[in-house]
């Protein structure tokens, strides 16, 4: 990566930003979220924070979350495009998210992941998250691992 990485923050879901998130979803996940699913989940969220990492004109990673309660920010989804992995981008997005939400007055960040996303689980633990529980969703075989960090 010769060009500097730039992380841009947004607190509103515009159509342009939705397009960027969709493109990243398709690169990051085998079953990406749809435009409708993203819009439904994020459209009117209180405390919405969307971070996109850019390498030049190319979006290469993202991290999205919102207010879960007045003290708790929920880090909902994020990822890094495969060709940009192992360059520290996920950690930079995580650190920036925590800096931003702490400045917004949140005391905790909460997230969840699955056992199959080992790199994300390890990143969160290395960043100071504690495992606080597991949850079983009816339509999913695998349990979710709940994590929380005091800011």
Language-model region placement:
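Acetyl-CoA-dependent GNAT
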Residues: 11-76, 81, 137
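Conserved catalytic-core motifs of GNAT/GCN5-like acyltransferases
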Residues: 110-114, 125-146
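Conserved short alpha-helix immediately C-terminal to the canonical SAM/SAH-binding motif I
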Residues: 93, 117-120
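Polar/charged side chains located within well-ordered beta-strands of beta-rich proteins
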Residues: 25, 63, 75, 94-97, ...
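Conserved GNAT acetyl-CoA-binding A-motif
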Residues: 101-113
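Conserved N-terminal entry element of GNAT/NAT acetyltransferase domains
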Residues: 1-16, 149-151
């Amino acid at each position: 990566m010769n060009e500097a990485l730039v992380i841009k923050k947004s607190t509103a879901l515009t159509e342009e930003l939705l397009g960027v998130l969709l493109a990243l979803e398709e690169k990051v996940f085998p079953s990406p979220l749809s435009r409708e699913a993203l819009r439904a989940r994020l459209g009117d969220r209180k405390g919405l924070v969307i971070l996109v990492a850019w390498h030049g004109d190319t979006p290469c990673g993202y991290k999205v979350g919102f207010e879960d309660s007045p003290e708790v920010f929920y880090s909902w989804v994020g990822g890094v495009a495969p060709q940009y992995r192992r360059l520290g981008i996920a950690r930079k997005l995580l650190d920036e998210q925590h800096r931003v939400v702490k400045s917004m007055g949140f005391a905790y960040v909460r997230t969840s992941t699955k056992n199959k996303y080992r790199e994300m689980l390890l990143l969160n633990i290395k960043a100071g998250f504690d495992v606080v529980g597991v949850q079983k969703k009816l339509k999913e075989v695998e349990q979710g691992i709940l994590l929380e960090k005091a800011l």
